[in-house]
Amino acid sequence: MTSEWWRTAAIYQIYPRSFADANGDGMGDLAGIRSRLPELADLGVDAIWLSPFYTSPQKDAGYDVADYCDVDPLFGTLADFDDMLAEAHRLGLKVIVDLVPNHSSDRHPWFQEALAAAPGSPERARYIFRDGKGEHGELPPNNWESVFGGSMWTRTTNPDGTPGQWYLHIFDSSQPDFDWEQEEVREEFRRILRFWLDRGVDGFRVDVAHGLIKADGLPDYTPPADAGSMGGNQHGLEGGVPLEPEIHDENVGAPYWGQEGVHEVYRDWRKVLDEYDGERILAAEAWVDPLARVAKWVRPDEMHQAFNFAYLETPWEAAPLRSVIDHSIETFAAVGAPSTWVLSNHDVIRHASRLALTADSLQGHGIGPKSPGLPDPVVGLRRARAATALMLALPGSAYIYQGEELGLPEAVDLPDEARQDPTWFRTDGERYGRDGCRVPLPWESDAPSYGFGPTDTTWLPQPAQWAEFARDRQRGVAGSTLELYRSLLAERRARSLATGDLEWIEGFGDDVLAVRNGSVLVVANTGSDPVELPAGDVILASAVLDGRTLPGDTTAWLAA
């Protein structure tokens, strides 16, 4: 890899509570992660990204942080983190950790101090407290609706028992938003960055990187019907044409997403990271439209990468895929950044299910047994394998979410009483939420909890079908999804595809993408009808080929 390793890296997302459990309490932990790192090095990824493991009440699976500079006992200790980090570096893996700057837990010492302090105090200034509307302040300060459902405001109770001010929380009421106009907040996060950089981490994935700053005056806002809960356009495409609205000053979207002032924060953070050697990076989770706006987060003096959610949200159709690939590369190149590519993460339906849905499912809503348009699992896995084979042939950096290398589908049939996503509770079960993509991984088909841990205890129940997806059933088995991923990553590296240039090849029909990247010709058939492959030795394919015929929902790499 080049010194700018992040430009080409294949980065594997670990959701710690669901990856591997070393102590048998049903919750994944840092010792479990450390024990399985050789499997990831063998898979062929370049780096790992860890979702939050910080001290937390776990009201939102760790994205409600009570102490940014310590490890929650659920996951271990700082010593366990240091051991895991050292082992990753020994294996040649970079380590990126999640950082959650938009909000803290309501159990964070600062917020507890704010609740105990008077309105207008320095303690309350760290968060966004406001008096309510109405004759007695009984109404929220504005009409904003939480990402998880319900009002974005919660009223406090004064020490004497009378109703008090309201505080803002874009997400759950247990996640109060910081006031990023306050220098004390900014200085605290510089300290947090340095704490982890000094320990040796290679970078940060920044949660809700398009949040933090709110519009002056906190004006009322009603999002359009097609808006995603996290800020981007919900579907991304219309009639096969990417929705790329022009950027105007008046077209800024929600007053709590993508405000211009957030870029000052990241320019400041970039200066902190540049004090350290080893190309430490910032990766933005920024759900904004269009891609030209996303590119603002990765200008040369800001962050290094931004997740390409436009690509993730693109359907398995040739024309929109080609459009978003071209537009992504062009848009990010204009600011000197690589495009990233991602198909799954801990907030969306796994792509082995999502790509076969026959009805829309809004981002963050999830699917369950009563959802319309539930996927055919055979079709879903076939499309997922083909989509991954296309993604890993593209230049730039690619993200892989734990379990997708096993072909895991969304766990649809979780019992209601087992669900833990705040979305499920705040919408009274109207939205299933994200639990289905967070179920603990299967490692060994015949072991307790399918090898996730030494006991049968798991924080979310594992479906019985997990046995057939277990890693030990796929390791070394030709044609398995695990071996497909290993081959794709090995060939991607050997043939320098991450630094290549694309040349589209015409003449294969409306449902087929054919693109040359260096020494590889990639042919992806998104339709149902088979097509004849051009000349060239087949390097690999996402499904079994019939001679020189490429079946539907299949991608092949050929020697160009």
Task: Map each language-model feature to its residues.
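A short, gly/pro- and small-residue-rich
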Residues: 541
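Active-site and adjacent substrate-binding regions of carbohydrate-active enzymes
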Residues: 1-536, 545-560
